[in-house]
């Protein structure tokens, strides 16, 4: 595919990890270990203000100490440090950032103010953001595992995009047991910048992606989202599960990632109109992933149903 404006997120030639650490089971330790063990094919730099080395690699106290340009940074440091990090990244010419750190819009007034600082700094330097409050991003074909998920993932042709990091972890664990691989795994978190529509725009033209699964808690930019879903569904199967079918679910989603959850019947009608399949449960989403992983795509109306009763076949 040609150079997409989100290439720095999905195909970075260099990555720096803020908060990379030797402290066992810390988020920074797991992220950097994943990057090393999954065989990332680009340049990799740990940034740690206290240590000269991290996991056997030379560490840098600041991004300004790195002579080479950095396309993507992964941030796993306390929330108060993130606005300053984004500012420093902008001065260094960074194109994209994955903010794993939580404690922003979902954490009350102080977190909302901090999130605003991060967004303003990113906009000043045209840095695109995934997160905050997310698991991270994976591109197995290039060894990019910028997540704190314990365990890898096989390369495949399914893209999975989710606002829930916990659900990402669950489906990745399940996929390993069921031999299902992924072209991309994107944990959106609070989706303060890059949204579902932009991710779909990338995936629809990605030759490694043959089908797309999504877990949605809420949509911020409905018009661009529906346009992107319509374009994607014309070319590739798109299957999603969305919470908020009931009032209690909508309230829980709002408190989880500060998402805006719209009227469910309106969403249902819109999804159906653009040709996207909505499933009702997480189990059904897992089943869809297994079905899509086989690579078989029926064409036309030559489908036979074998059943031991009339009801199940209707």
Predicted regions and their residues:
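Catalytic-core regions of core metabolic enzymes
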Residues: 1-314
């Amino acid at each position: 595919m040609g150079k997409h404006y989100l290439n720095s997120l999905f195909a970075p030639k260099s990555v720096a990890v803020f908060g990379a650490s030797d402290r066992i089971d810390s988020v920074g330790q797991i992220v950097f270990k994943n990057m090393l063990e999954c065989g990332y094919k680009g340049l990799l730099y740990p940034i740690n203000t206290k240590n000269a080395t991290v996991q056997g690699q030379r560490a840098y106290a600041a991004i300004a100490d790195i002579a080479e340009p950095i396309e993507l940074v992964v941030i796993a440091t306390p929330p108060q440090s993130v606005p300053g990090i984004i500012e420093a990244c902008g001065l260094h010419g960074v194109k994209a950032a994955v903010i794993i750190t939580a404690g922003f819009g979902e954490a009350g007034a102080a977190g909302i103010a901090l999130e605003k600082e991060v967004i303003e700094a990113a906009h000043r330097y045209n840095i695109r953001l995934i997160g905050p409050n997310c698991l991270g991003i994976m591109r197995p074909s290039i060894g990019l595992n910028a997540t704190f998920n314990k365990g890898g993932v096989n390369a495949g042709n399914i893209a999975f995009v989710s606002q829930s990091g916990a659900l990402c972890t669950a489906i990745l664990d399940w996929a390993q047991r069921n031999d299902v691989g992924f072209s991309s795994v994107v944990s959106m978190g609070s989706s303060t910048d890059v949204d579902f529509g932009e991710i779909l725009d990338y995936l629809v033209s990605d030759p490694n992606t043959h089908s797309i699964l999504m877990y949605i808690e809420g949509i911020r930019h409905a018009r661009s989202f529906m346009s992107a879903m319509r374009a994607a569904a014309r070319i590739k199967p798109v299957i999603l599960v969305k919470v908020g079918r009931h009032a209690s679910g909508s309230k829980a989603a709002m408190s989880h990632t500060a998402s805006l959850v719209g009227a469910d019947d309106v969403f249902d009608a819109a999804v159906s109109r653009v040709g996207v399949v909505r499933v009702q449960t997480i189990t059904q989403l897992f089943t869809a992933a297994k079905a899509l992983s086989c690579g078989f795509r029926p064409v036309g109306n030559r489908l036979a149903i074998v059943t031991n009763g009339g009801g199940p076949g209707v």
